[in-house]
UniProtKB/Swiss-Prot annotation:
Keyword check for Iron-sulfur: yes
Signal peptide (residue range): none
Pfam family, one: Glutaredoxin
UniProt xrefs under InterPro entries: Glutaredoxin (IPR002109), GRX_PICOT-like (IPR033658), Monothiol_GRX (IPR014434), Monothiol_GRX-rel (IPR004480), Thioredoxin-like_sf (IPR036249)
Protein name: Probable monothiol glutaredoxin 2
Similarity field: Belongs to the glutaredoxin family. Monothiol subfamily.
């Protein structure tokens, strides 16, 4: 069962921030290549995003997997919706969909 404090923390994080990356490490120091790739993509697009390091809290990490029904990290959320992990973000970036999504839904990227 999901810990109540973790559920509230997750919901609050994705509600208060237009773009949130739950990742291993931080945007300044990613602790895995997959997290680093997503950070690099968001930085290339010039998007401000909130990063949450999942390495220091095992219960948060496990509860986030249940919350999102996604087994791995990083997990990118835009406007409260899970976009996906590294492979999906990379594919969306390469085909231009991620930039369009960020322009249309968050207005974080200007035309």
């Amino acid at each position: 069962m999901m810990e109540n404090k973790n559920l509230k923390f997750i919901q609050n994080a994705i509600k208060k921030n237009k773009v949130v990356l739950f990742m291993k490490g931080t945007k300044e120091m990613p602790a895995c290549g997959f997290s680093g790739t997503v950070v690099a993509i968001l930085n290339k697009l010039g998007v401000e995003f909130s990063d949450i390091n999942v390495l220091f809290d095992t219960s948060l990490r496990e509860d986030l997997k249940k919350f999102s029904d996604w087994p791995t990290f990083p997990q990118l959320y835009i406007n409260g919706e899970l976009v996906g992990g590294c492979d999906i973000v990379k594919e969306l970036y390469q085909n231009g969909e991620l930039e369009k999504m960020l322009k249309d839904e968050t207005k974080l990227i200007k035309n």
